[in-house]
Amino acid sequence: MTLSGGGSASDMSGQTVLTAEDVDIDVVGEGDDGLEEKDSDAGCDSPAGPPELRLDEADEVPPAAPHHGQPQPPHQQPLTLPKEAAGAGAGPGGDVGAPEADGCKGGVGGEEGGASGGGPGAGSGSAGGLAPSKPKNSLVKPPYSYIALITMAILQSPQKKLTLSGICEFISNRFPYYREKFPAWQNSIRHNLSLNDCFVKIPREPGNPGKGNYWTLDPQSEDMFDNGSFLRRRKRFKRHQQEHLREQTALMMQSFGAYSLAAAAGAAGPYGRPYGLHPAAAAGAYSHPAAAAAAAAAAALQYPYALPPVAPVLPPAVPLLPSGELGRKAAAFGSQLGPGLQLQLNSLGAAAAAAGTAGAAGTTASLIKSEPSARPSFSIENIIGGGPAAPGGSAVGAGVAGGTGGSGGGSTAQSFLRPPGTVQSAALMATHQPLSLSRTTATIAPILSVPLSGQFLQPAASAAAAAAAAAQAKWPAQ
């Protein structure tokens, strides 16, 4: 504070009065009485120095209003502020070493120095607090994740797709923080593009040369941000298409059990199917019919432009079961696999009845139908395992051919047409030849009706009918 001329006394007295009212006089005033008396005795060297006021006189002086333009002194300023200011931050006119010798100059000069020194310091402090804030604001990292930054870049592009360089260019131009630290965050953008399902890679067109693929947003991930705000995502986006296909495949394999799609792949080539075959035909050749139909449907989805399957064009395949296993199947599942066999036996009986006489044909047909049920222990495996029955079935045609030429053929047919179980009974009961004939025909008929394939059923039936007619014609003559 600067003191001058005539108004300095009122200023000094006003300052002293305000300070004395606020500070406890009993505590502060005891040590200052002696100092004030000493200062008054010494006097001030300056001719225009203001007169000193004692504390008892200061109580009677009313406070003076400050001049216009001067700041009002603070109420918390203690009584010894001029000396403290002189000691703490003395200005150019303050003498710190001798405060008692030159109290007026030291006090006034210290106050001037403190005021002059405090002004620029306060200004520089306030200016220093505001000046560094501007560059800091420009370098603040944006509160957006890398996924949000990539989404912003893709959505603002005209074609809604950008390359990696285009995304980095948009982020650098939009945010100065990333512009100054450009090479450090480019790999982070690349990793987020590759590892998140919400971004889809699009290869370049043939007529669009350049480096790098395009990236766009998955159509189902448009609502992954709340209300269009890029500050927060609702949840992590995942594609459910592949999981849905895997669930369908697993369900299909469980429904078919052992006849799964893996049965077709087990016998296929290294690429999952035999060479030169359609997937549907390959699956139908090695798997269950139900699994083949499922494999055909799956192949139609996987190979939409492949050739049509070959399986419907070809005739049904012949069962590759040997005769012994087929006999076991017939014995175990007679009621389920028997309709075709029963139809063939019925047709064989009808042919035999048409070739013979009326009575013999009726007896033969009735015995042919009743013989399998009357003998439940009969099976094809027993006849084939007996030994002579296997070549006997093949020798029927030779016997019949010889019987048409002469009597030697008749004896051959008589010896081979008798089954092993009825040889002794036929020798002992020579008078009952129709019964032995019927038993012979009933015994041979199942052998001829169960060939290795279904292609020889009709020739076997005609051969059996011819053998029965030849035997009936030859045996009454003997």
Curated annotation (Swiss-Prot):
Sequence ranges of Acidic residues compositional bias: 21-39
Indicate yes or no for the key word Repressor. yes
GO BP annotations, alphabetical order: anatomical structure morphogenesis; cell differentiation; in utero embryonic development; negative regulation of transcription by RNA polymerase II; positive regulation of transcription by RNA polymerase II; regulation of transcription by RNA polymerase II
A Pfam cross-reference name: Forkhead
| Residue range(s) of DNA binding per entry | 141-235
Q: Looking at the record, which segments are called Disordered? A: 1-136
Which residue windows does the record flag with biased composition (Gly residues)? 104-128
Q: How does it assemble?
A: Interacts with POU5F1.
The entry's function note states: Binds to the consensus sequence 5'-A[AT]T[AG]TTTGTTT-3' and acts as a transcriptional repressor. Also acts as a transcriptional activator. Negatively regulates transcription of transcriptional repressor RHIT/ZNF205. Promotes development of neural crest cells from neural tube progenitors. Restricts neural progenitor cells to the neural crest lineage while suppressing interneuron differentiation. Required for maintenance of pluripotent cells in the pre-implantation and peri-implantation stages of embryogenesis.
- Name under which the protein is recorded: Forkhead box protein D3
Q: Which organism is it from?
A: Homo sapiens
